Amino acid sequence: MEETQDSSSSKPKNTDENFSLWIEQYFNHKCCITFLTGCYSCQWQYREWEKTELGSCCCSRKEQFFYMCLVIAFILSVLFLFVWVETSNEYNGFDWVVYLGTGCWFFWSILVLSAAGIMVAYTTLLLLLGFLLLWERIELNLHTSHKVFICLVIVLCSFLLAVLSHFWKDKWLIAGLSLQIFAPFVHLSLITVMIIISWPLSICVARLESEVKVRRYRMADYEQEIQERCNVFQRLRALQIAAGLSFLIILLCLYLMPLGIYSPCILKKENLGPKPTLFGHRGAPMLAPENTMMSFEKAVELDVSGLETDIYLSFDSVPFLMHDYDLTRTTNIKEVLPSAAGNHTSNFNWTFLSTLNAGKWFLKHKPFFGMKPLSEADKRRAGNQSIPQLSELLALAKREQKIVIFDLFGPRPGHPLRNTFVRRVVKVILDSKIEQRLIFWLPGFDRDYVRFMAPGFQHVGRLWSIKDLTKHNITIINVDYKRLFYAGLRDYKEAKIYIHVYVINEPWLFSLAWCSSINSVTTDNIELLNQLSRPLFFMTPGFYMFMWLFLDIASAVIIGFVFCYNWIKEIKRERWLEAAASSGLLHSETITDITENNDASQQKPEVAPTSANLAPENMIELQKTEPKTENL
């Protein structure tokens, strides 16, 4: 019985021992080095790597060149990812443009975003692996496949950035706007990053200083190499100054960064204007097929202030709601009349247009990424939608007292209403008996006639000068948000111009509009923007000042402590060196023992010790063994 108990009690011990052995076997320094070299150089066989000396080149010229290429690839990929993430408000428009060129609806914007994220992750991982290998003082040897992929990343990112600069210059404007609102938080985050970086940097700077002093001891025994070693000292000092001074300059720039920051969302609470009212862009296109009565009714249910749409006139003079110049994307014309699918929207009679289905496409191809799933009732309702007339929208707006704003597209040459389409639309509006104040009249053609026939319409201008707006007696502007913030927003506010911007879907952009005292916005994302009770990233000047000074002082104290701690640690190593030198411990046999105890690279006995080899724990072992040698 006792033997049985002993054997049963020994099982957990054996299990623990086996687990410890397993941990030691697979999670040790050798395995770590093998993993790093395997990922970076595809060399998965462990061997004793020859370590480079501090102050010497870490790799060949060729490897230095490709490491610089890696840094360039990282910068380009991060830049492209930043621009693309910040332009998420424009993803639907990008997908629509690609659809016009390819005829295939797909979330191309998300595909590009995924590719950018993969490139950033890939280059970041390679940079991290290279840094860890340099930290271990192992010579870099990037695998050929990585070199090819790095070149592809540089070419692809350069091409995509060039395309953005040529075809979508306004995307850079969005990136600039994002910096306005995110700059205070980027500043605070970067200071935190600098605190993290200070730890390895302080170790590096202190180790370089210690390395210089260690090599000075070596010069006493190798006087013939003094000239050569002086060059090494210069390189070590240069590395030390370059690393420390660069860090200090960047840190000081970050400390002073708030002096150059302008963010509309840093203002006093009493200066924050009311929340901008929302206009449904073609209704509520995230909840129902765009420009259908279901879409506008959904927008009304969400309590929007206005409804935005697009108007064409059929060949038999009926104004109807449609955005595209053809019917292929939002109707089933390819099934009903494939031969005429590419014809212009205004070339059809209303008798034919009224028979088309305008909702099935919405169920097949979601227009927005991340849309909520529809209920079964909404699916059935959406699948039965048709193209609505303008009169139907006006009846809804009249009943619910909602503002109506629209883009009016003129007919093509040969259309019966080629020159009188504005008058036809005005007649339809007046016949609906809707209050004229609820019409935001945007079209600029035949405006004098409109003023005469409907003096109650609220005329809306574009991004005109204050002088032109005053000349035409216009107090409302409808502008692209990307252009407005760079075109003298303050001047329009001082002139008491009502500002309406389009199309804003992202909360951070809506917060920017709110902090800038914009009156109303057109949006696809009504539900999300309705939930905002205050602007995102809003801060009072006093709170930001407190955070700025507090983080600056705290970071300076922490960074100073980190540098002092690692510096003192290296000073202790130097004292052990002096004690060892004065007691005669530093001869060739002792140096060899130190090297072996620290798993250093295999060196000849004549090679001098480095700061890493002269750790206090090694010197303790030496003190135990060395006196015997001296007595002999």
From Swiss-Prot:
Question: Which example biological process does GO assign this protein?
Answer: lipid metabolic process
Q: Does the keyword Glycoprotein apply?
A: yes
Q: Which GO terms describe its cellular component?
A: cytoplasm; membrane
Question: Recorded GO terms, molecular function?
Answer: metal ion binding; phosphoric diester hydrolase activity
Q: Entry's PROSITE patterns?
A: GP_PDE (PS51704)
Q: Which residues are glycosylated?
A: N343, N349, N384, N473
Q: Which residue spans belong to the Cytoplasmic compartment?
A: 1-64, 136-147, 202-240, 564-632
Which EC numbers does the record give? 3.1.-.-
Q: Where is this region: Disordered?
A: 596-632
Main localisation: cytoplasm
Q: Which domain of life is it from?
A: Eukaryota
UniProt keyword terms in alphabetical order: Cytoplasm, Glycoprotein, Hydrolase, Membrane, Metal-binding, Transmembrane, Transmembrane helix
Q: Which InterPro entries does the protein's record reference?
A: GP_PDE_dom, PLC-like_Pdiesterase_TIM-brl
**Transmembrane ranges?**
65-85, 115-135, 148-168, 181-201, 241-261, 543-563
Binding-site list for a divalent metal cation? E308, D310, H323
* Composition bias, Basic and acidic residues: 623-632
Topological domains annotated Extracellular: 86-114, 169-180, 262-542
| EC top class, as a word | hydrolase
Q: Where in the cell is it found?
A: Cytoplasm; Membrane
Q: What family name appears in the similarity comment? A: Belongs to the glycerophosphoryl diester phosphodiesterase family.
Q: What is this protein called?
A: Glycerophosphodiester phosphodiesterase domain-containing protein 4
Where does this protein come from, organism-wise? Mus musculus (Mouse)
Q: What is the lineage of its organism?
A: Eukaryota, Metazoa, Chordata, Craniata, Vertebrata
